[in-house]
């Protein structure tokens, strides 16, 4: 699909008031369900404890490459000048002293530092997996390799980018008045560009979920806008009010840093929730929605799709599943897939497609009923796509399950206790 068609599609969706209102309600529910403010508070505390080990890893990577040694101080100054409030700038001196005293750390101290860093990275991954409704995390080895790759390559790319920018801006073109103005504008824009690119990469890499670029970009844009508002608000407040300095004195840098980290995480997580909502939201007309309690109907249809795909030697990716079964929401689909994977009825291939792992002819219906814990609805309700072959098969199976229940559930509750001892004759 071309970019023009994609933009036209989004414009048409915005004009659809019902779709827009439905997405607004869906987004608000996701914000509440994700409990982002509590998650940001937890991440803020763990991030504070991980600052020193993170700095050790970052600058240790740069020290391993002599070509980047001269850029360590420039990278540090760039980070603290553009991303950290001025009142918390004293933290930079503390980090520098910690790096200078690195050789004095004991083995136990180094283990504690590495453990705090791994705990922070694990908490970040868990939070993003929760936002994207991912039930199963990556294997531990894969997780560690991703952490290490992000830290090392991210550090080298940041230093290389600064070196490249310095080389470009040293060209004769930028020595003119207009060129100097352009270079100054670029350096002013650089922090926001760095934030935007980093957040997009975080959304794409950290969660155990295939996040599309078209969903990550708006989420990252929202996060950057919120972070810039936070930085402006900090600058305005700290420049006009001296309450923190008066109350905490020399220790004022710590609460300011903690609050700044918390609000930064709130911004990043709100952007992540927007990106997750955009990928999970599917507008369903009333006739295409599963009635509450009829999830088992969707499960039976889903298994029919997998059976048909297996006959043709194919698997199904999640986009294909949602296209074939429009009554399934992304959340319900993820829940069903995770449950079927847990009982080893489904598995994923190397391309990420879902495949049947067992023959449905030897899987009793009772196993699905017990493991997935889905209710069997007694009442009859209009069901979407009931007239196609999968709907007919699922509806027939559902009817067989609930017929015996109807007669049992029709009796009065009092009849259950007519033969208790001690009752009057």
Swiss-Prot record:
Protein keywords: Cell inner membrane, Cell membrane, Membrane, Transmembrane, Transmembrane helix
Cellular-component GO terms for this entry: plasma membrane
One short Pfam family name for this protein?
Virul_fac_BrkB
Q: How does it sit in the membrane?
A: Multi-pass membrane protein
Key word Membrane present in the record? yes
Q: Can you say where in the cell this protein is located?
A: Cell inner membrane
Report TM segments: 48-68, 105-125, 154-174, 182-202, 216-236, 250-270
InterPro entries registered for this protein in UniProt: UPF0761_bac, Virul_fac_BrkB
Q: Hey, which family's this protein in? A: Belongs to the UPF0761 family.
Q: What is this protein called?
A: UPF0761 membrane protein XCC0860
């Amino acid at each position: 699909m071309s970019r023009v068609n994609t933009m036209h599609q989004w414009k048409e969706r915005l004009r659809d008031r019902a779709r827009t209102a439905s997405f607004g309600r869906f987004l608000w529910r996701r914000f509440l369900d994700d409990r982002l403010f509590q998650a940001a508070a937890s991440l803020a505390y763990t991030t504070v404890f991980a600052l020193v080990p993170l700095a050790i890893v970052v600058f240790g990577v740069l020290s391993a490459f002599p070509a980047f040694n001269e850029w360590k101080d420039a990278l540090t100054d760039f980070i603290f000048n553009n991303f950290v409030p001025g009142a918390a700038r004293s933290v930079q001196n503390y980090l520098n002293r910690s790096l200078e005293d690195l050789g004095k750390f004991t083995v136990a101290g180094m283990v504690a530092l590495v453990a705090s860093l791994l705990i922070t990275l694990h908490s970040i991954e868990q939070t993003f997996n929760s936002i994207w409704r991912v039930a199963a995390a990556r294997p531990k080895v894969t997780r560690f390799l991703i952490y290490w790759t992000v830290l090392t390559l991210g550090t080298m790319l940041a230093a290389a980018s600064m070196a490249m920018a310095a080389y470009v801006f040293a060209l004769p073109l930028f020595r003119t008045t207009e060129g100097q103005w352009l270079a100054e504008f670029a350096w002013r824009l650089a922090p926001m560009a760095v934030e935007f690119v980093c957040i997009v990469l975080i959304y794409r890499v950290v969660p155990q979920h295939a996040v599309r670029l078209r969903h990550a970009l708006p989420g990252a844009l929202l996060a950057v806008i919120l972070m810039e508002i936070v930085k402006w608000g900090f600058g305005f407040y700290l420049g006009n009010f001296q309450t923190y300095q008066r109350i905490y004195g020399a220790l004022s840098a710590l609460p300011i840093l903690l609050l700044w980290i918390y609000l930064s995480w709130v911004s990043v997580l709100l952007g992540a929730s927007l990106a997750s909502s955009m990928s999970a939201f599917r507008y369903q007309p009333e006739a295409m929605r599963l009635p509450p309690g009829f999830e088992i109907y969707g499960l039976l249809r889903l298994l029919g799709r997998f059976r048909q795909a297996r006959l043709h030697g194919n698997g199904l990716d999640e986009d294909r599943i949602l296209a074939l079964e429009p009554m399934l929401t992304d959340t319900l689909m993820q829940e069903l897939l995770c449950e079927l994977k847990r009982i080893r009825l489904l598995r994923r291939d190397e391309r990420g497609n879902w495949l049947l792992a067992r023959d449905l002819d030897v899987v009793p219906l009772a196993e699905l009923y017990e493991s997935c814990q889905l209710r069997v609805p007694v009442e009859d309700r209009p069901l979407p796509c009931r007239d196609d072959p999968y709907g007919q098969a699922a509806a027939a199976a559902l009817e067989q399950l609930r017929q015996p229940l109807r007669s049992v559930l029709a009796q009065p509750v009092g009849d259950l206790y007519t033969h208790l001892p001690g009752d009057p004759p």
